[in-house]
């Protein structure tokens, strides 16, 4: 009987040792995974600092909300719209938008004429251009949440 007890003790110790080794291997895999993920993330951050953001390299995109004031102040619409920009024409100055479309036929696709003002603001939200260029007298009509969709608002 004594032999059976010793065998049972030995068997229990052996099973406990295997369970301990299994736990240690699971912990080791977890630690190694955490270290690998951390190193990968740090490399990602380091490479991001070395390579400038694409948004910093390319010219800033612009969205113009056309009013009579804005039309009068900018002299060369050909140059302004040839960059990464678009012009949204308010209903009250649709005639100016049509005039510009005739003058600038090569970039007329960048001039969008709207029938109502709320559609203009919706388009500004969806375009998500970096800069919104707008006349000072139209800022009161501008929705409050618009600042979330553009990087900067310039008043002319």
From Swiss-Prot:
GO biological process: peroxisome organization
Topological category with respect to the lipid bilayer: Single-pass membrane protein
Subcellular location: Peroxisome membrane
GO cellular component: peroxisomal membrane
Residue intervals passing through the bilayer: 24-46
A Pfam family hit: Peroxin-22
Keywords associated with the record: Membrane, Peroxisome, Peroxisome biogenesis, Transmembrane, Transmembrane helix
Main location (coarse class): membrane
Family that this chain belongs to: Belongs to the peroxin-22 family.
Physiological role: Involved in peroxisome biogenesis.
Name of this chain's protein: Peroxisome assembly protein 22
High-level lineage: Eukaryota, Fungi, Dikarya, Ascomycota, Saccharomycotina
Protein's gene: PEX22
């Amino acid at each position: 009987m004594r032999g059976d007890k010793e065998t049972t003790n030995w068997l229990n110790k052996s099973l406990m040792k295997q369970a301990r080794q299994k736990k240690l291997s699971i912990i080791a895999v977890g630690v190694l995974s955490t270290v690998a993920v951390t190193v990968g993330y740090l490399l990602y951050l380091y490479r991001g600092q070395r390579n400038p953001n694409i948004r910093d390299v390319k010219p800033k995109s612009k969205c113009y909300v056309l009013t009579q004031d804005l039309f009068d102040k900018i002299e060369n619409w050909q140059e302004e719209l040839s960059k990464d920009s678009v012009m949204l024409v308010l209903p009250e100055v649709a005639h100016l938008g049509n005039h510009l479309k005739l003058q600038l036929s090569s970039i007329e696709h960048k001039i969008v004429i709207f029938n109502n003002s709320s559609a203009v603001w919706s388009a500004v939200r969806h375009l998500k251009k970096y800069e919104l260029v707008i006349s000072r007298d139209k800022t009161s009509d501008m929705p409050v949440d618009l600042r979330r969709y553009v990087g900067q608002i310039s008043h002319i």
